[in-house]
Amino acid sequence: MGTRPTDEQYGAVCFACRCYEAECVAVRLLARSETSAQQLGFKLLKRGFEKRVVESVFPVLKRYSWLDDTRFARAWLRNRVDSRPASRAQLLGELKRRGVSHADAEGALDLLFQEQDEETLCLRLLEKLRRRGYGPHTLQRALQRRQFSPSLVRRCLAVETEGA
């Protein structure tokens, strides 16, 4: 008969099994939808995985490009801007709250704003709010709350008024 594993060896095997289990759960979650590393970490912790297990899984997921905050930021921005236009400043804040680094968020925003400018987003939101029955003063406040600059808001309101 062989020798029994030491407590240290047994602990290492248990840790490796737990990491494999966390990796499988993470891949299933990522297959459903793109997510940031921070969001994935929260989901894994919520499912009962220890922090050190979660942290050891991230390098594997990144090495195989299953977890990529830059890709998440780009996908999230496309979806977010299509459904709810917002200013660059607001989008940056929302990406950072989702755990995307400032550099990754800025890079994704630069790409987005190469395709469409902030004025276009402001005008789209203005049109959407106008259809909901917002009046001129309410429109101005709503656009400024979404962190469009006061000068851009005035310009968009003027363009929208000319077109009406």
UniProtKB/Swiss-Prot annotation:
Compartments reported by the entry: Cytoplasm
Q: What top-level branch of life does the organism fall under? A: Bacteria
Alphabetical UniProt keywords? Cytoplasm
Q: Does the keyword Cytoplasm apply?
A: yes
In its keyword annotation, does this UniProt entry include Cytoplasm? yes
> What PANTHER family does the database record attribute to this sequence?
REGULATORY PROTEIN RECX FAMILY PROTEIN
Name used for this protein in its record? Regulatory protein RecX
